[in-house]
């Protein structure tokens, strides 16, 4: 739930065509137009409670250029720390990747080797779920709720299922099945999910 706390608020005029904040504010002025969630690493030191006065400190921890199958990539590692009464409660790193927009309509399906899981859960995905998650996390990225934009402007085959929503669902599933609160959570996105 900490992703809903202290989101950056931008005027409409400070948003890009994709409805993300224009680059060059908190995140660096990367020239690649496509922004994607590449994962996160979260340390939970102690719980947040209703009524806590939370201070969030955000910084850019690292920027690196790499070459991938789809071309040049720019990785930005953002660091977020959440404090209550000067005590750190949560420390998190977000990995964000920027790249060119490909007009290739044949997006490669990524098959990962999975072992049999002890616990599984099916969810029904719907654009309303993605819209609601976008709203509660203050994520305006149109690829999650604007089908014409996602398919005609960014050339995805469908709406893109939120990487952070995937992470949220995985974390909840693991906590439900372990019947305890996570102390550390690592999530890596390797391909868009539709």
Give the ranges of each region predicted by the language model:
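Aromatic-acidic/polar surface patches that form glycan- and anion
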Residues: 47-49, 159-163
């Amino acid at each position: 739930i900490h992703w809903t706390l202290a989101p950056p608020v931008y005027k409409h005029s400070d948003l890009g065509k994709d409805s993300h904040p224009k680059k060059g504010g908190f995140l660096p002025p990367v020239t690649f137009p496509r922004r994607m969630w590449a994962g996160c690493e979260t340390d939970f030191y102690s719980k947040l409670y209703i009524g806590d006065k939370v201070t969030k400190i955000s910084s850019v921890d690292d920027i690196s250029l790499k070459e991938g199958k789809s071309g040049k990539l720019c990785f930005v590692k953002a660091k977020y720390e959440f404090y209550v009464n000067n005590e750190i409660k949560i420390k998190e790193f977000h990995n964000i990747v920027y790249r060119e927009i490909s007009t290739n309509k044949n997006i490669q399906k990524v098959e990962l080797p999975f072992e049999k899981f002890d616990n599984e859960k099916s969810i029904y995905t719907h654009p309303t779920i993605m819209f609601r998650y976008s709203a509660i996390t203050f994520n305006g990225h149109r690829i999650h709720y604007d089908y014409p934009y996602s398919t005609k402007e960014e050339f995805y085959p469908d709406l893109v299922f939120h990487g952070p929503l995937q992470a949220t669902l995985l974390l909840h599933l693991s906590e439900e099945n372990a019947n305890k609160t996570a102390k550390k959570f690592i999530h890596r996105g390797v391909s868009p999910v539709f």
